[in-house]
Amino acid sequence: MDILKRGNESDKFTKIETESTTIPNDSDRSGSLIRRMKDSFKQSNLHVIPEDLENSEQTEQEKIQWKLASQPYQKVLSQRHLTMIAIGGTLGTGLFIGLGYSLASGPAALLIGFLLVGTSMFCVVQSAAELSCQFPVSGSYATHVSRFIDESVGFTVATNYALAWLISFPSELIGCALTISYWNQTVNPAVWVAIFYVFIMVLNLFGVRGFAETEFALSIIKVIAIFIFIIIGIVLIAGGGPNSTGYIGAKYWHDPGAFAKPVFKNLCNTFVSAAFSFGGSELVLLTSTESKNISAISRAAKGTFWRIAIFYITTVVIIGCLVPYNDPRLLSGSNSEDVSASPFVIALSNTGSMGAKVSNFMNVVILVAVVSVCNSCVYASSRLIQALGASGQLPSVCSYMDRKGRPLVGIGISGAFGLLGFLVASKKEDEVFTWLFALCSISSFFTWFCICMSQIRFRMALKAQGRSNDEIAYKSILGVYGGILGCVLNALLIAGEIYVSAAPVGSPSSAEAFFEYCLSIPIMIVVYFAHRFYRRDWKHFYIKRSEIDLDTGCSVENLELFKAQKEAEEQLIASKPFYYKIYRFWC
């Protein structure tokens, strides 16, 4: 029996199994609360693999995609969760503090760098959204690479991407401790690491709902803080506020200037900080398997444009007008969570007596941002580990899912990495994390490149197999050209980072300086060939377009019904005023 292709009886079975993951286990209801809690950690009995799956005539990739599409996640995320995760989920220390390191390269270099990375990020999110809405499988875009490009490339992307989140977790825990130390330096930072570690781990044991509700609340705080800063910043630029010396405008763009010298090298230097600021913007697409409605994913992806335009570009312009790039405080921070190096604090503290109050306020915002990133680290890494286990690229124990849809082994591995946060008590902490981050430093650009390439390959496969673009659940606003632009931009960003690593700004070239930023390149090459050697496949370095699986796990089960619904929706939008049409296009 063909158990994987669209339109057959087993597809109905797959749909029933996937949808039933939100139904509680009846056998647990009669027990005590403690027993129900205990039993909830047992392996899910809802994820049933058909006995004839392994014996079917389908390809190995089709079998893997079926498994990824039928993982027993709970579909509980609503539109409000996804909207706030998309808007505020990536507003972290990269923006609130890391922006200062980029500003030291000049306001024009900062703006150009953020525009380039922001454009790249918009292309990436649109490409990932198209694939995630079409194939809402475990691991999302990280596993789509294996489906549309090559399994070894997919393994390299997924492992490096997961490693980046795993390493970020203990680093952000240390950030929580150091942020608290701004108010109280008498308590050992390791105590604060322990408190936040327990809080984050317990929070993730509440499942995806605990993650989503926490992110919803924290994102609101961050968004409000950004809006407050934008309003105050505009007033200060116009010459308002206490201790005002008059209209500022673009004063600092002329003196000390728009670019620090050397211009090109400083421009390339902004790419790293910009990538750090935008990193995780694609996280909302990872929730596709736990979302109530796929359309909520597409709407959240459309909001990326406004998030980039308002929260990043507008903020960058205001910061560039309020703080000169040669302000020594920009590079005076003792660590990546030092509030004194925040350009937000520097800009507002120039108002005089407000300085101390502003520092306290921004420290609260930064603490909220760091806790939010910690939460995202455990969520993202645990889901990626589970997907790698389900696809057979990691030991099968990694795919363990309990009855509440929690990837417990993935959460446990994240927790194990979190223990590295106690290195805050060591004098070698900075050096250790410098080299840990070097393991995945450039992997963000590589991951983004592969996401865009996956969308291009998806469109090419549709054409090669005589299929129409009309069956795409959500089409990227930029189409396939957005994927092409994303690939080009990310390739240029990788080249720029390699260049500035080989010839760093303000210091001589050295192997140590180069590998601090580019160690991930040889690491990825080794991982790629190690996986290919393990598979013993040296004949096929990419999947042929005609052989790409376009059916397994596809959200469009009834093509004719889907087309009718799309046509009705288009007719409804066509009957609305022009402003509504614009709203639906961008939101």
From Swiss-Prot:
Q: What is its main location?
A: membrane
Q: Which residues carry this modification: Phosphoserine?
A: 10, 27, 44
Alphabetically ordered keywords of this record: Amino-acid transport, Endoplasmic reticulum, Glycoprotein, Membrane, Phosphoprotein, Transmembrane, Transmembrane helix, Transport
Look up the record and report any one GO term of the cellular component aspect: plasma membrane
> What biological-process GO terms show up in the record?
amino acid transmembrane transport; putrescine transport; S-adenosyl-L-methionine transport; spermidine transport
Extracellular topological domain ranges are 104-109, 184-186, 241-266, 324-360, 428-431, 497-509
> Where do the record's region annotations for Disordered lie?
1-31
Q: Name one Pfam family in it.
A: AA_permease
Membrane topology term reads: Multi-pass membrane protein
Q: Where does the protein end up?
A: Membrane; Endoplasmic reticulum
InterPro entries found in the cross-reference section? AA-permease/SLC12A_dom, Amino_acid_permease_CS, Amino_acid_permease_fungi, APC_YAT
Renumbered to this chain, the Basic and acidic residues biased-composition regions fall at 1-18
Residues spanning the membrane: 81-103, 110-129, 163-183, 187-207, 220-240, 267-287, 303-323, 361-381, 407-427, 432-452, 476-496, 510-530
Which superkingdom, per the lineage? Answer: Eukaryota
Glycosylation sites noted in the Swiss-Prot or TrEMBL record: 184, 243
Family indicated by similarity: Belongs to the amino acid-polyamine-organocation (APC) superfamily. YAT (TC 2.A.3.10) family.
* Miscellaneous: Present with 1300 molecules/cell in log phase SD medium.
**This protein is called what?**
S-adenosylmethionine permease SAM3
Taxonomic source organism: Saccharomyces cerevisiae (strain ATCC 204508 / S288c) (Baker's yeast)
